[in-house]
Every structure is written in structure tokens, then in C-alpha cells.
Amino acid sequence: MQAKIKNKRVLVKFSGEALAGDNQFGIDIHVLDHIAKEIRSLVENDIEVGIVIGGGNIIRGVSAAQGGIIRRTSGDYMGMLATVINAVAMQEALEHIGLDTRVQSAIEIKEICESYIYRKAIRHLEKGRVVIFGAGTGNPFFTTDTAATLRAIEIGSDLIIKATKVDGIYDKDPNKFKDAKKLDTLSYNDALIGDIEVMDDTAISLAKDNKLPIVVCNMFKKGNLLQVIKHQQGVFSMVK
């Protein structure tokens, strides 16, 4: 992959399901530790890092509302709280290995974390702290992909990284189809109109309107995040 990326501030987004590891629910401590060490390698190379984590390892708002008992709005708020749980867990993992970390929530939970204030978030980043953004956008009906894109734009990230279990963007699910073809680069429009799953349309449209590159890469390959960001190498795909 030859696409050039030169940046100092990034936002890394990964799913809550990734935290569960091979389990279907909860947080795998080994996965948490691996991610923390990958983030540390970025900080040690003078990269300012913001993080958004999904909450699907605990609850998903859409799924919670399917039974008809829990309304979608309430289900989404439950999902936001799940992301705060994951954010606090990641904060603990990062601080355990020596990284100064702050959690900022879009919903006020002052006993646990700071409320989201973008100027304060930027100041934390400038001081070398990792900032984890919890509770999505603070509004129902918006995904954590959209929240991640929004936060990336607000804090002036050079790109948003969607860290996954695969090596990039494929024309179909590589876990199901052996003939899946990896796409190194993709336009915003192609990502919007095609059947290729990158992010939801709202997130991609936000990125397009603000010329924010989207990078999809494998977070489970040791050192890959740093290779992608710092050295313009590694295995990844880009939407731009």
C-alpha cells in the first residue's frame, strides 16, 4: 500500500465486540492489554490519540429494542452507557502501562469521568494524554461510527482509523468468502453507494464533507497501527 499518510493526531475506533475476544460477551483482559500496548506504541512515537469504543460486547440498542419491550430510544441510551463501561476499562488498561488517560462522556457522569468539552479534549491531547470518548454522540439513533467521525472532526484529527479483525476493506466478507478481494483505496462515493461495509452512511458522509480520510486496518497484528500511521506502511485500506 503506497498511500501517504502524514499526521500527528488520530482517532482510533474499534468495536465493543472486539473487546470480548473469542467470547460472546464482556471484556477479554488479554485483548484489552493488547490494544493498550498498541496505543502506547503510538504515544511513544509522538502521535496524539483519541479513542472511541463501541458497546456491542455488553448491549446494542437496536438489538435491545427488537423484542418490543424496550423502546429504541431507551435501548440506544443503554448502549451509550455500555460504551462508558468499555471506556473506563480501557482507561484502566492504558494507565496500568503508564499512559495518562482521560475519559470524556457525551452524557454527564461526573463521578466517573469528565463531560465532553472539545477544547478540553484538545488540551489533553496536546499534553500527550490519551482521550477516550464515551456515550456516543449523546443522542439516540446515531452509531458509534458516526460518533467517532464526529469527534475526529471536532478535535482536528488527520484521519480516523477503524481498527478491525481484518486487513482492510474487501468486496465481500473475507471470513465467509475465500475469493474476497481486498480494496486498497476507495472513494467516499463508492463507499456510500456500494454494498461494501465500511461505516454507516452518516459517518461516511460526515467524513466526506470534512475531507477526513478513513483507514481500515487489522488491530490484532502487532505493530500494524504504528506502521500505518507513522511509516505509511503496514496492511490497510483507505477511503478518501
Swiss-Prot record:
The keyword Transferase applies. GO terms for molecular function: ATP binding; UMP kinase activity. InterPro entries: AceGlu_kinase-like_sf (IPR036393), Asp/Glu/Uridylate_kinase (IPR001048), Uridylate_kinase (IPR011817), Uridylate_kinase_bac (IPR015963). Inhibited by UTP. Pathway: Pyrimidine metabolism; CTP biosynthesis via de novo pathway; UDP from UMP (UMPK route): step 1/1. UMP binds at G55, D76, T137, G138, N139, P140, F141, F142, T143, T144. One of its GO terms (biological process) is UDP biosynthetic process. GO terms for cellular component: cytosol. It comes from the Bacteria. Coiled coil: none annotated. Catalyzes the reversible phosphorylation of UMP to UDP. PANTHER family: URIDYLATE KINASE, URIDYLATE KINASE PUMPKIN, CHLOROPLASTIC. Homohexamer. This is Uridylate kinase. The lineage of its organism: Bacteria, Pseudomonadati, Campylobacterota, Epsilonproteobacteria, Campylobacterales.
